[in-house]
Amino acid sequence: MAIPITVLDCDLLLYGRGHRTLDRFKLDDVTDEYLMSMYGFPRQFIYYLVELLGASLSRPTQRSRAISPETQILAALGFYTSGSFQTRMGDAIGISQASMSRCVANVTEALVERASQFIHFPADEASVQALKDEFYGLAGIPGVIGVVDCMHVAIKAPNAEDLSYVNRKGLHSLNCLMVCDIRGALMTVETSWPGSLQDCVVLQQSSLSSQFEAGMHKESWLLGDSSFFLRTWLMTPLHIPETPAEYRYNMAHSATHSVIEKTFRTLCSRFRCLDGSKGALQYSPEKSSHIILACCVLHNISLEHGMDVWSSPVTGPVEQPPEEEYEHMESLDLEADRIRQELMLTHFS
């Protein structure tokens, strides 16, 4: 069971009742446009988060000097969507940057605790078949239940000796493995992998790979790009297509794989703390991975609430940490080769 967390208003403790306190900020006192511009989400969505997370962010008995769950959530949303602890953000809700930092930490942990509630593969056969039908309707590849890829998020250097987080571009990052459906909803998110690991290694060592290898998603497969090895459950593009069927397969694969590329762009445009435009995440790898996961939870909740996340406006340049450059991964799995050949002959000849 989650342990309730209370954040004290340090500004009130320092300055007393004469200082602007959190009780004076009310959602009903500001416009919808203000909430969207400052915190990136509409009023009803914020109210839902207060209901969802309130018990984890406050004690059972109210204390006048505790920062309310509502204000903690606004502070966290402000950081996630802007990427910085701006003075104006804290001033808007009446707290210091130090208090904002504690609010972000608490809201992040509350969201991470609920990750499995919002990020998962469908459990029933009807939903799985609906996934396959949707992907088939997109580009004609049957049996697909998700698209997989990795996204790097820049973090500060943990320490001078630890090179495991240094990627091929010489930047410190986390390599985050994700799977999404055709709407961009995330079904798997693993955010703690060091940036030095190649995508294929991350997938090989992931719980996602263990699930498919154990046969948990029978008669289904994922689509991944050429940074991954071909598997019986993971279809990749051909390195050098030669026949018309192979060209058509690669084109269909590219069209389908673009769903997760679009999802990554959406995550980074909505949650600017991930895109590097305000610098790397200034936290330990563990805390950074939790922030990334919290943003992914919010992304999925947005979709559940009918928000059109793909049309969200980009307020500035989206600067993803440089992507890794990989050579094409040749298949070592003869059965996977056979399945892909049969797929091309049956559906793309």
Swiss-Prot record:
Pfam families: DDE_Tnp_4 (PF13359)
Chain ranges of the DDE Tnp4 domain: 148-300
Kinase is among the record's keywords: no
GO molecular-function term, one example from the UniProt record: nuclease activity
Cofactor dependency: a divalent metal cation
Primary site of residence: nucleus
Tissue specificity statement from the Swiss-Prot or TrEMBL entry: Detected in brain.
Entry keywords, A to Z: Cytoplasm, Hydrolase, Metal-binding, Nuclease, Nucleus
Membrane-crossing segments per the record: none
Enzyme class: hydrolase
EC number: 3.1.-.-
InterPro entries with a match to the protein in the record: HARBI1-like (IPR045249), HARBI1_animal (IPR026103), HARBI1_dom (IPR027806)
Localization in the cell: Nucleus; Cytoplasm
Binding, a divalent metal cation: D149, D199, D225, E261
GO CC field: centriolar satellite; cytosol; nucleus; plasma membrane
Family to which this protein belongs: Belongs to the HARBI1 family.
Subunit structure: Interacts with NAIF1.
Stored PANTHER family: NUCLEASE HARBI1-RELATED, PTHR22930
Role this protein plays: Transposase-derived protein that may have nuclease activity (Potential). Does not have transposase activity.
Name recorded for this polypeptide: Putative nuclease HARBI1
Biological source species: Bos taurus (Bovine)
Lineage of the species this protein comes from: Eukaryota, Metazoa, Chordata, Craniata, Vertebrata
